[in-house]
Curated annotation (Swiss-Prot):
Catalysed reaction, written as an equation: cytidine(34) in elongator tRNA(Met) + acetate + ATP = N(4)-acetylcytidine(34) in elongator tRNA(Met) + AMP + diphosphate
Binding site for ATP: 7-20, 101, 153, 178-179
Phylogenetic classification of the source organism: Bacteria, Bacillati, Bacillota, Bacilli, Lactobacillales
NCBIfam families per the UniProt record, alphabetical: PRK13670.1 (NF010191)
GO cellular component: cytoplasm
Protein name, per record: tRNA(Met) cytidine acetate ligase
EC number in record: 6.3.4.-
InterPro entries: Rossmann-like_a/b/a_fold (IPR014729), tRNA(Met)_cyd_acetate_ligase (IPR008513)
Length: 383
């Protein structure tokens, strides 16, 4: 039995994702395709453009059999922890194979992952403060394994491979060549496949949405066209500004990943910044990537502390967002053997501890912005 897993954000789901699901189906055959998908907050430190249930529904309609929500404590983390948490959860669900999109599927990711995992993580190698940690890490990888990997999906694919190796290689890796636009490419008007970031930019800049039907499934294109609010940092910035200005230095110091005096820098620069882009520019240094600072801003906005993340990570459960007929059968037959708790319905008891407590709390802001309940009263989607 080949139970194929996919780690995803689907932010939003587009034809490139549909291609990846089709490739996964070639491996799975009649066996299930299991997706672990980030919820209403994504790895780069932003709100998702659509709700987790909207994105899960499109994924199920496009060929996925089970969609679970990646806990916040894994979803909003750098690539290494994002990969480790997601692969560990897939293995606990009985997944045997991992399919992921990259720019060059000819690379032997399993081999490269094992070689990188053997490199001592000696922080003395990363003391050049004129460059970010990630830049120095990529340079070290190129030096040690003989391959320069600097494209975003290949970097993430390597993180999957390293995590898989460190967990004892529970999953067989299947890299698939991406089709269409690159990760951050602008929309190519005559093309068919567009990147998620390009589609988000189109929506956020109020451009014509008539071409969406060529890039995303028809039902999703209709929903996106009708959607009145597209979450973004400029929308959230007043809330972040209030949070920072009303918090003491000691309060800010408790925020997850707040370090090296960034609490003082954020306090100082928030008064001088007209919008989130300017704020990021003002607190940016060569030591930190913009992604790291966006995640830190999100933790600050949502008041996520070190203790919150530890409690969530130590008691991670998985929220079931939806299933197909095949997915239901797989759940019924194998749920007792899963090594993680599956939550199908949020109630007051389950929402008080572990990863679900953090999920429910952080989702409240998304609910306020979008006006749609995300946990209480929701049931898994069935297609």
């Amino acid at each position: 039995m080949s139970v194929v897993g996919i780690i995803a954000e689907f932010n939003p789901f587009h034809s490139g994702h549909e291609f990846l699901l089709n490739q996964a189906r070639l491996i799975a055959g009649n066996d299930p395709i299991v997706v672990v998908m980030s919820g209403n907050y994504v790895q780069r430190g932003e709100m998702a453009i659509m709700s987790k249930y909207q994105r899960a529904k499109v994924a199920l309609q496009s060929g996925a059999d089970l969609v679970f929500e990646t806990p916040f404590s894994t979803a909003v983390e750098p690539a290494d922890l994002f990969s480790l948490g997601n692969i560990e959860q897939l293995a606990k669900l009985g997944v045997t194979d991992l399919v992921f999109g990259v720019e060059n599927a000819n690379l032997n990711f399993a081999y490269l992952g094992s070689k990188i995992a053997e490199i001592p993580q000696n922080h003395m190698d990363f003391k050049d403060y004129s460059q970010t940690y990630s830049t120095q890490y990529n340079q070290m990888v190129a030096r040690e394994v003989g391959h320069e990997v600097n494209q975003p999906n290949a970097i993430l694919g390597l993180a999957y491979a390293v995590a898989n190796h460190n967990l004892g290689s529970p999953l067989k890796l299947h890299p698939v060549n991406r089709i269409g636009a690159g990760h951050d490419d602008l929309l190519q008007r005559n093309g068919v496949v567009q990147s998620a970031s390009a589609i988000r930019n189109l929506l956020l800049h109020g451009e014509d949405t008539s071409n969406l039907k060529y890039w995303v499934p028809k039902a999703e294109a209709i929903e996106l066209s009708k959607q009145e609010i597209y979450p973004n940092w400029n929308l959230l910035y007043p809330f972040l500004k209030y949070r920072i200005e009303s918090s003491s230095i000691d309060d800010l110091r408790q925020i997850y990943q707040m370090s090296e005096g960034l609490e003082y820098k954020m306090k100082q620069e928030i008064h001088l910044s007209r919008d989130f882009t300017e704020f990021l520019r003002r607190i940016k240094s060569k030591r930190y990537t913009y992604s790291r600072l966006r995640r830190l801003s999100l933790y600050t906005l949502l008041n996520v502390t070190q203790d919150d993340m530890i409690a969530s990570f130590n008691e991670e459960s998985l929220m079931l967002l939806g299933f197909s007929k095949t997915g239901r059968q797989y759940l019924k037959k194998n749920r007792k053997d899963f090594q993680t708790e599956i939550i199908s319905k949020v109630d007051k008891r389950s929402a008080k501890s572990g990863s679900l407590a953090l999920q429910v709390r952080t989702d409240r802001l998304f609910e306020q912005i979008m006006g749609v309940d995300q946990n209480f009263g929701q049931r898994p989607i069935e297609v």
